[in-house]
Amino acid sequence: MKEAELNRDVAKFCTDNQCVILQPQGLGPKSAAPMAPRTLRHVQAIVALVVVTVFFSLLALFVVVLQPWRQKQNEDHPVKAGLHGGNYSGSDNCSQFVRRAEMQEAIQSLRASGNSSSCHKEIQTLKYQMDNVSSQVQLLGGHLEEANADIQQAKDVLKGTGALASETQALRSSLEVASADIHSLRGDLEKANAMTSQTQGLLKSSTDNTSAELHVLGRGLEEAQSEIQALRGSLQSSNDLGSRTQNFLQHSMDNISAEIQAMRDGMQRAGEEMTSLKKDLETLTAQIQNANGHLEQTDTQIQGLKAQLKSTSSLNSQIEVVNGKLKDSSRELQTLRRDLSDVSALKSNVQMLQSNLQKAKAEVQSLKTGLEATKTLAAKIQGQQSDLEALQKAVAAHTQGQKTQNQVLQLIMQDWKYFNGKFYYFSRDKKSWHEAENFCVSQGAHLASVTSQEEQAFLVQITNAVDHWIGLTDQGTEGNWRWVDGTPFDYVQSRRFWRKGQPDNWRHGNGEREDCVHLQRMWNDMACGTAYNWVCKKSTDWSVARTDQS
């Protein structure tokens, strides 16, 4: 989090590439906050307009109604006008009674006067004006109702504004809580980043420590990866490379197993040596304790000898003997100390062997992981190889289909005709039976064989009663008819295809027998050297074999 801004109504958070703004719904800078004052001003303006309209309407009504009546009263009754203009100090009720009486007298005088028609017109005019005033009053009443409705709507808007204000306050409190949560989450994120950096440092140090030990294994894995890349590049040799990879891994596992066994033997020998060294150490410890006891005894003896030396000088020889023994004891003590240092060296060797064993176990585990990954990759390669083989088969099938389609188009362009899964060629020139068969074989076909009534009808329709050689002959064995393309000859089914009295094996003047069959609506045997048109038949499998001609 690069930047964060918190206001009373808006929270803004920015990173290196984006910013996020959090604000209560419907409380933008131009939304609900100014709505209440604006609506209030609108209501006040409507109320003022309605009041002014009502005032001026009443004023106009007053002027329109009273002005003609006053003019008429002043013209016809000057006395009564003078009375109105005089000093009258009665009460309001009395004045109203006098005015009513005056109006009644004026109406009676108007009725009695000779200008009754003009008065009637004025009365009609006053009624019309009164109707207009009534309509205006009704309009004003409608406007007043609309104003009341607007005022009620304004009150509702003000109530909604109060609700929005409370909702705004609630959203502000929620925003403050969210801001506190964001600050807390930011602190947690910083802690997580610190822990991540520490973890990365630890991982980096661990990687640096183990990189040297895994260098040899890494080279082996690189070789395996290079072999795998070679496998991916040429899947045709993938099986051989996979077997070599498995042999290599098996050889590596055998070597590692041998090394582990050797390490186990070494550990066993080291354990035995440790046991022996412990026993020697116990023996040396006992000897050291004995030597310490001897030293203490020697010190006691030396103290006694010193005491005796003070008393007599004859003990010098004994002191020298004791000194010699003391030197021997010192030499034995030095020997014991050297043995103790050898024991420490053996302990360090044992610890080194244990460390090497742990490293070997780690390498074995890594090799196992690499072996599993290699096996997984080999399985993937096998799957990819299967997919590739399937794709190659599909491509081969598509290629064969395309090739077949091209051959079909080529045959159609060469006037071959298709019927019931076979292609037939009907020649325009004439050849002998053997020449016609050789031509058909050169085209990958044979002279046509007929195996059904439908095929017979098709050949008859195309040949149109013109003689055409077909692939039936009994050369070699008279009466043993066979199709030249190897199709089995059905004597029973073929009886209906022969002309009446055929085959008759007629001998011609040149001595040649009729050993070949031609089609001219029906079958007939004929001398094979006769020149006829012919019909070739090609199978759609494109694998027609040539038979020997006798």
Curated annotation (Swiss-Prot):
<keyword id="KW-0325">Glycoprotein</keyword>
<keyword id="KW-0735">Signal-anchor</keyword>
<keyword id="KW-0254">Endocytosis</keyword>
<dbReference type="GO" id="GO:0009897">
    <property type="term" value="C:external side of plasma membrane"/>
</dbReference>
<keyword id="KW-0812">Transmembrane</keyword>
<keyword id="KW-1015">Disulfide bond</keyword>
<dbReference type="InterPro" id="IPR001304">
    <property type="entry name" value="C-type_lectin-like"/>
</dbReference>
<dbReference type="InterPro" id="IPR018378">
    <property type="entry name" value="C-type_lectin_CS"/>
</dbReference>
<dbReference type="GO" id="GO:0005886">
    <property type="term" value="C:plasma membrane"/>
</dbReference>
<feature type="disulfide bond">
    <location>
        <begin position="516"/>
        <end position="528"/>
    </location>
</feature>
<feature type="domain" description="C-type lectin">
    <location>
        <begin position="438"/>
        <end position="538"/>
    </location>
</feature>
<dbReference type="GO" id="GO:0030246">
    <property type="term" value="F:carbohydrate binding"/>
</dbReference>
<keyword id="KW-1133">Transmembrane helix</keyword>
<dbReference type="InterPro" id="IPR016187">
    <property type="entry name" value="CTDL_fold"/>
</dbReference>
<keyword id="KW-0472">Membrane</keyword>
<dbReference type="GO" id="GO:0051132">
    <property type="term" value="P:NK T cell activation"/>
</dbReference>
<comment type="function">
    <text>Receptor with an affinity for galactose and fucose. Could be involved in endocytosis.</text>
</comment>
<dbReference type="InterPro" id="IPR050111">
    <property type="entry name" value="C-type_lectin/snaclec_domain"/>
</dbReference>
<feature type="glycosylation site" description="N-linked (GlcNAc...) asparagine">
    <location>
        <position position="87"/>
    </location>
</feature>
<dbReference type="InterPro" id="IPR016186">
    <property type="entry name" value="C-type_lectin-like/link_sf"/>
</dbReference>
<dbReference type="InterPro" id="IPR033989">
    <property type="entry name" value="CD209-like_CTLD"/>
</dbReference>
<feature type="topological domain" description="Cytoplasmic">
    <location>
        <begin position="1"/>
        <end position="42"/>
    </location>
</feature>
<dbReference type="GO" id="GO:0051861">
    <property type="term" value="F:glycolipid binding"/>
</dbReference>
<feature type="glycosylation site" description="N-linked (GlcNAc...) asparagine">
    <location>
        <position position="209"/>
    </location>
</feature>
<dbReference type="Pfam" id="PF00059">
    <property type="entry name" value="Lectin_C"/>
</dbReference>
<protein>
    <recommendedName>
        <fullName>C-type lectin domain family 4 member F</fullName>
    </recommendedName>
</protein>
<dbReference type="GO" id="GO:0005534">
    <property type="term" value="F:galactose binding"/>
</dbReference>
<dbReference type="GO" id="GO:0038187">
    <property type="term" value="F:pattern recognition receptor activity"/>
</dbReference>
<feature type="transmembrane region" description="Helical; Signal-anchor for type II membrane protein">
    <location>
        <begin position="43"/>
        <end position="69"/>
    </location>
</feature>
<feature type="glycosylation site" description="N-linked (GlcNAc...) asparagine">
    <location>
        <position position="255"/>
    </location>
</feature>
<keyword id="KW-0675">Receptor</keyword>
<feature type="glycosylation site" description="N-linked (GlcNAc...) asparagine">
    <location>
        <position position="93"/>
    </location>
</feature>
<feature type="disulfide bond">
    <location>
        <begin position="440"/>
        <end position="536"/>
    </location>
</feature>
<dbReference type="GO" id="GO:0006955">
    <property type="term" value="P:immune response"/>
</dbReference>
<dbReference type="GO" id="GO:0010628">
    <property type="term" value="P:positive regulation of gene expression"/>
</dbReference>
<feature type="glycosylation site" description="N-linked (GlcNAc...) asparagine">
    <location>
        <position position="115"/>
    </location>
</feature>
<keyword id="KW-0430">Lectin</keyword>
<dbReference type="GO" id="GO:0006897">
    <property type="term" value="P:endocytosis"/>
</dbReference>
<feature type="glycosylation site" description="N-linked (GlcNAc...) asparagine">
    <location>
        <position position="132"/>
    </location>
</feature>
<feature type="topological domain" description="Extracellular">
    <location>
        <begin position="70"/>
        <end position="550"/>
    </location>
</feature>
